[in-house]
Every structure is written in C-alpha cells, then in structure tokens.
C-alpha cells in the first residue's frame, strides 16, 4: 500500500558567504551587515561576522555570531564593537550539522601559524573520512560541520606549506564535494571555488574596498560594482599588493547547480554571466511550450516563482495575474514543527484574492513539488474561493534523488516523485493537470551552462556515498 502524498514542505536554501577588505583601513562591519542581509534568502538559521585590523596586532579577531536573522543578531552597538578592515561573514541554513550556536559561522581557528577565519557554502561528500583521519591523529572538533573539517585540514597543511594558498590547494586535493569558501588570514582575503563550480562566488569592488560574495546582489546592495565571477577551481587572493589568481585546481568538467537559477539565487543576481531573472523567464516560457493549458490566467506562488509565471504568461498569451496576498511577517512553512502547524502556516501566510479567481481557470506555477503539502493546500484554498480549474506547472523536473552538495533535498523515501507517478501526484494534490519542466530544457534555461541535475536524473558529477552523507556529521 502506498503511503499518503500529504508530505511536509522540504526544499531549503543553503548558505551565503561574504567578505570585505578595505585597503585604506576603514571599518567594514556595517557594510558586512548589509551584505549579509542581501544574502538572507540563502540561510535564516544563523549568521556571523568576523573582522580583524590588518594594521593592528597580527592574529587578533573580533567575531560575533548568533542564531536568527541578520537584523535579529546584529545591532548598532554590536557593529560598533566589530572594528576592523578585513571581514568574513556567513548566513546559514544547515545541510550538515545541527542548528546550534556551536555550528554558526564564520569559524575562527587559532593555530601555530596564526589565525584563520572561514565561511563555507556547500557540502563535502567525503567529510566523514576527512574528519576521521584528523581525529585519529588527535584533532578535537568543536562542531558537527564539514566546514570545520576544511578549516582543520587547511591549518594542518599550513604547517608545512609556504603560504595559506598552498595549504588551501593541498586541502582541495583531498576534498570531494561542493564548496565556495571565503577565508581571511591576518593580511589576506581569499576566495575559493570548487572545480565543478557547484556553488557560486563572485568578486566586486567599492572604491578601495574589495568584496567577495555568494551572489552579485550582495555586492551591489552595499554600493559596490560587480567585477566578475570567481571561476570554478580558482583561488583569488587579495592583499595590499594586489589581486592574485591561481587556477591550478581547474578542470574541464563543470557542473553548476541548476537550482541557483530555478530558486536559490536572488532575482537581481548574475551568476556565471547568466541573469537569474532572465533564466527564470526562459524557464517559464519553456514550460508553456511543453505543457500548454486552456486557462484564463497565469499566477505564481509567492515569492518562489513569480518570474517563471510571467515567462509562462508571455509565451502562452494568457494574462498574468496576482491571486495571492502574502503576509510577509509569517515565517517560512518548514520552520513549524508539526504537520498541523505547517498547514495552518500556509493559510496564514498566503490568502486568496477571491475576485481574481472566482470562476476562473488558473495556471499555477511553482518552482518545485518535494512533498506536496503546500500545493495541496493552495489548490484546496483556490477552489474554495471559486476557482473553476487549477492547472499546476512546475519550473523544475520531478525530484527523484537526494542532493549531496549543499541543497537540503530530502532522502528518496520522502520525495513523492520517486515512488509516485505524475498522474498520482496530480490526483492527490487536487490539480486538474500537472506538468513539470523537462530535464532537456534546463541547460537552455540556464544560458547554456553545464549543469548539475543529479537531483532529477541521478547522474552525479562525482562519486557519492550511499545513504545520507549529512547523517554522518549530525
């Protein structure tokens, strides 16, 4: 007997990293605050800022971290105490490790060669093996994060390596998985991107201040100018002597995370020379060509896929309408601990504009269906408000496999599409029809980039372990 398709929502963001180096010695904490706020969509569990003064005593770091949103953790007095011209920041949603204060970032490590501050976005597939190797030689860990494993290996390699960059390269040679790192040593700001380019990282500048960030929107939000993406397999080092690039980690094969363009990245960002806004418009248009519908209006589910809905409407010639009022002060549905509370949260967060839907045939566009709870409730609400038909269109293919690279996609048994047909899902959520984005349309949607589509196809760009790798570090 099949289990019920009434699942909780389950697609979560990853993390965001941000770094600044003011070459003229000005404090960066305030701009760090705004930069992290611009990346808040990438993680809402915790955040932190670590700063140091490159003109002061070497190795002295001021760090403040906490659980919650950026504007909940940091206040005016907190920022005033964070004096320094070199900073690393982080916003977190946990993909490995529990949601505790110990697991907040940036990590600050004091070791034989100095001090290392590290912020990490991504997930390692061999973190458990790397951690065990360190523990067998006496290492003691303070967190359950794979990020600490990276930091420890860099610190250990630095004992013999002539520079921090060389220690990073030696660590990368042992590492499998996704990572975008921003690291500060006492006189350097260093950005590192994994050879596949799974996680984004970019470079910008504001006057004499160099900036690194997960997304370009964080650079422009602090008044900076986006310069370029840090390339897959590239290490960029910023010092008072200039900007230096090392591409010795690069490889031919690349696999950019497709979900940056479907969901994760902010609409005003450019990632690897591709506009996120334009990518979502193309995705909606492709969906309209593959799965047309006889309907009176097209609408998106706030805020996840309004742009794809606009693309669908433009390509189909069906008018785009707003049919939901969103209460912006209600937390995201996955935060609630019980199924009943999750369902109630959907009703409170989104209310139907009845005059817009009464008697109408609706194309409803969303970015994903992972477990199905939210969509089932929305369709029920729409039909109760008088909608005649609801045709669901999803701007991603069905989720069939877990992600090992930093996206919190549940295990196979929780993914409804892995054990139920499209027709079964359609019946269970109460839709009049259901269409998913074809896998073959994804690359064109993302501007022709080589993509990681493993969560849809099971074709991982590297060897991955059996089971949930995140369980090994929780």
What are the roles of these predicted feature ranges?
Residues 351-365, 369-370, 394, 464-465, ...:
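Mobile, glycine- and charge-enriched loop segments
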Residues 95-96, 126, 198-199, 219-221, ...:
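Flexible loop/turn segments at secondary-structure boundaries
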Residues 139, 160-161, 292-296, 314-321, ...:
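Secondary-structure transition/capping motifs at alpha-helix termini
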Residues 298, 305-312, 316, 320, ...:
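Extended, hydrophobic alpha-helical segments in both membrane/secreted and soluble proteins
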């Amino acid at each position: 007997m099949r289990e019920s398709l009434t699942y909780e929502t389950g697609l979560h963001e990853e993390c965001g990293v941000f770094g600044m180096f003011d070459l003229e010695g000005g404090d960066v904490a305030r701009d760090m605050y705004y930069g992290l706020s611009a990346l808040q969509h990438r993680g809402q569990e915790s955040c932190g800022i670590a700063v140091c003064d490159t003109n002061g005593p070497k190795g002295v770091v001021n760090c403040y971290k906490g659980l919650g949103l950026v504007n909940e953790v940091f206040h005016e007095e907190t920022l005033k105490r964070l004096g320094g011209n070199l900073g690393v920041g982080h916003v977190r949603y946990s993909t490995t490790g529990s949601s505790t204060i110990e697991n907040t970032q940036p990590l600050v490590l004091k070791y034989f060669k100095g001090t290392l501050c590290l912020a990490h976005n991504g997930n390692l597939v061999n973190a458990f093996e790397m951690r065990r190797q360190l523990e067998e030689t006496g290492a003691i860990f303070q967190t359950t994060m794979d990020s600490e494993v990276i930091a420890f290996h860099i610190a250990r390699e630095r004992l013999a390596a002539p520079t921090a960059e060389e220690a990073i390269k030696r660590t990368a040679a042992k590492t499998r998985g996704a990572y975008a790192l921003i690291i500060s040593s006492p006189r350097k700001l260093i950005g590192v991107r994994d050879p596949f380019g799974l996680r984004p990282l970019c470079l910008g500048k504001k006057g004499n201040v160099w900036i690194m960030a997960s997304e370009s929107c964080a650079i422009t939000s602090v008044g900076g100018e986006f310069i370029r993406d840090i390339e897959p397999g590239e290490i960029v080092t910023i010092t008072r002597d200039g900007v230096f690039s090392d591409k010795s980690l690069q490889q031919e094969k690349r696999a950019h995370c497709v979900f940056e363009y479907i969901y994760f990245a902010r609409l005003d960002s450019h990632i690897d020379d591709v506009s996120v806004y334009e990518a979502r418009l193309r995705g909606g248009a492709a969906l309209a060509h593959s799965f047309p519908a006889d309907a009176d209006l097209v609408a998106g589910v706030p805020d996840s896929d309004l742009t794809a809905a606009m693309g669908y409407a433009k390509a189909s010639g069906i008018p785009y309408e707003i049919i939901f009022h969103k209460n912006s002060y209600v937390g995201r549905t996955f935060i609630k601990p019980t199924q009943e509370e999750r369902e109630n949260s959907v009703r409170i967060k989104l209310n139907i504009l009845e005059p817009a839907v009464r008697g109408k045939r609706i194309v409803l566009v969303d970015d994903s269906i992972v477990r199905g709870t939210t969509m089932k409730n929305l369709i029920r609400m729409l039909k109760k408000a008088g909608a005649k038909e609801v045709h669901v269109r999803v701007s991603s293919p069905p989720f069939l496999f877990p992600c090992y690279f930093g996206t919190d996609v549940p295990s196979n048994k929780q993914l409804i599409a892995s054990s139920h047909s499209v027709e079964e899902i359609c019946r269970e959520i109460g839709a009049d029809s259901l269409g998913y984005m074809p896998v073959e349309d994804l690359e064109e949607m993302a501007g022709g980039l080589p993509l990681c589509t493993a969560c849809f196809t099971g074709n991982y760009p590297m060897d991955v372990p059996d089971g949930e790798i995140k369980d090994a570090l929780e």
